[in-house]
Amino acid sequence: MVWCIGTCIFLFKLLKYFIQKVVKITMSRDPEIISKNMRKIHSKDTSIELQLRKALWHKGYRYRKNYKVLPGSPDIVLTKYKIAIFCDSEFFHGKDWEILKLRLEKGKNPDYWIKKIEHNRSRDFETDKKLLFLGYTVIHFWGQDIKKHTDECLQAIEEAIWDTNFSNDTIKLSDE
């Protein structure tokens, strides 16, 4: 008898959990809620940018933010070292694009989203080419990498700084 009551309680809680999930998913597809959520997404001073900038500042690196002088207005630019850093969100810049594309094809308004993200990806590629032509080192970080592995991101930036300094020293030595 006790086993039966315990099982019923467990099944009731499980059913309640799934009902809440279904209601939440259904409610989150409401166009007004989607529109409200999209308005909260910023293109400048995002949480991932702020986190990386704070870490760079703490290490003593000075930078320009959203530097409009350069193509693509990189999120962070270390002008002294000619390093352009982009903090990319996984969705809008198409991380794991083939998988994301399949998910988008099943969702609402797939043509719009696929076209938008493909355009973002090609624009990112063109921007990178322009910056490389200008002699900049270009670094892209995914948002989750910044959130979860900020120290590793800093280490990658410091390695790029070291590479820049080393190549500049080599050029100076050859001129002497």
Which role does the model predict for each range below?
Residues 9-176:
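Nucleic-acid endo/exonuclease domains
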